C-alpha cells in the first residue's frame, strides 16, 4: 500500500506527455467523470473519475495520471480499482524522446493486491500531422506483482505471494480528428515479463460540446496472460464520460 500511495503522489505532482502531439502548452490535460458496465472477473455497473495533466518546459516534460472506478450491487462491492502513473520525458528532437516511468495499480477483483512498474525507454512520434498523430514507446524496467491470497476450496488455500521480474514495456497512442469537433483515439499498452503479460487497449470517440466540455464513449479491454487461479484472463469495460479539457 505504501508503494501505491507513493505512485499516486508522484502521479499527482509529476505531469507531462509521453507523446507530443500538438505544439506544447505549459499546462494541458483533462478531468473526467464516467459511468459504465464492466464484464469479466466482475459483472457490474460502476462509476469513476480520472485526471490527466502534463507540463512542459523547454525540452523537459512531466506527466501524471490518476484514475479510479467503483461499483456496488445490492450493498455488495463489485468493483474497486485505482491506478496512478508518473512520467518524465526529455525531448531529443521534434519526434524522438527519452523517458522514465513509474506506475501502480490496485484492483480488488483482479487476483492481485497491487502491481507496480518502474522503467526507462525511448518514444518516437511516427505521424505528426494536424489531424492525425501516432506515437510509439518502448522500454525496460522492473515489475512487481503482489498476488492476493486465494481460497480455492474449503480445504485448499493458496497464500499470498510476491513476483518480481524484469519487464518490457511498449505503448501506442493514435489520434485522428474526424472533424473540428470529433476525434477518434486508440491507445494500447503492453507490459511483458517472464511471469505474465498485461495488455490493454482503449478505443474512444470524443465529441466537443461547448467550451472545454466534451462527451466521450469508450471501450476498454484488458488481458492477463497468466491470471491467478480462479480468475479470468480478460475484462472489458464500456464507459460514457463527461470530460473537461484543461489548456
Q: At which residue positions do the language-model features occur?
A:
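Membrane-embedded beta-strand positions of outer-membrane beta-barrel proteins
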Residues: 31-33, 64-66, 100, 120, ...
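Transmembrane beta-strand segments of Gram-negative outer membrane beta-barrel proteins
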Residues: 23-37, 60-64, 184-186
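Transmembrane beta-strands of outer-membrane beta-barrel pores
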Residues: 35-39, 57, 68-72, 102-108, ...
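Solvent-exposed loop/turn segments connecting transmembrane beta-strands
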Residues: 37-45, 73-79, 106-114, 191-199, ...
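Outer-membrane beta-barrel "beta-signal"
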Residues: 119, 205-212, 234-247
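Repeated loop/turn-to-beta-strand initiation elements of outer-membrane beta-barrel proteins
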Residues: 59-63, 95-98, 130-134, 178-184, ...
Amino acid at each position: 500500500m505504501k508503494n501505491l500511495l507513493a505512485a499516486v503522489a508522484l502521479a499527482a505532482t509529476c505531469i507531462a506527455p509521453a507523446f507530443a502531439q500538438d505544439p506544447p502548452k505549459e499546462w494541458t490535460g483533462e478531468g473526467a467523470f464516467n459511468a459504465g458496465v464492466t464484464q469479466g472477473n466482475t459483472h457490474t455497473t460502476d462509476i469513476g473519475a480520472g485526471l490527466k495533466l502534463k507540463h512542459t518546459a523547454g525540452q523537459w516534460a512531466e506527466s501524471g495520471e490518476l484514475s479510479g472506478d467503483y461499483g456496488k450491487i445490492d450493498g455488495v462491492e463489485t468493483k474497486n480499482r485505482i491506478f496512478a502513473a508518473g512520467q518524465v520525458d526529455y525531448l531529443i528532437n521534434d519526434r524522438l524522446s527519452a523517458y522514465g516511468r513509474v506506475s501502480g495499480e490496485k484492483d480488488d477483483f483482479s487476483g492481485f493486491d497491487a502491481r507496480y512498474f518502474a522503467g526507462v525507454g525511448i518514444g518516437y512520434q511516427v505521424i505528426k500531422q494536424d489531424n492525425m498523430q501516432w506515437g510509439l514507446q518502448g522500454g525496460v524496467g522492473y515489475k512487481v506483482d503482489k498476488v492476493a491470497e486465494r481460497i480455492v476450496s474449503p480445504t485448499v488455500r493458496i497464500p499470498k505471494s510476491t513476483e518480481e521480474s524484469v519487464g518490457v514495456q511498449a505503448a501506442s497512442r493514435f489520434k485522428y480528428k474526424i472533424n473540428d469537433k470529433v476525434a477518434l483515439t486508440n491507445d494500447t499498452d503492453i507490459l511483458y515479463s517472464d511471469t505474465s503479460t498485461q495488455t490493454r487497449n482503449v478505443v474512444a470517440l470524443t465529441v466537443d460540446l461547448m467550451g472545454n466540455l466534451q462527451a466521450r464513449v469508450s471501450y476498454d479491454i484488458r488481458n492477463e496472460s497468466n491470471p491467478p487461479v480462479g480468475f479470468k484472463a480478460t475484462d472489458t469495460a464500456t464507459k460514457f464520460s463527461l470530460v473537461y479539457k484543461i489548456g
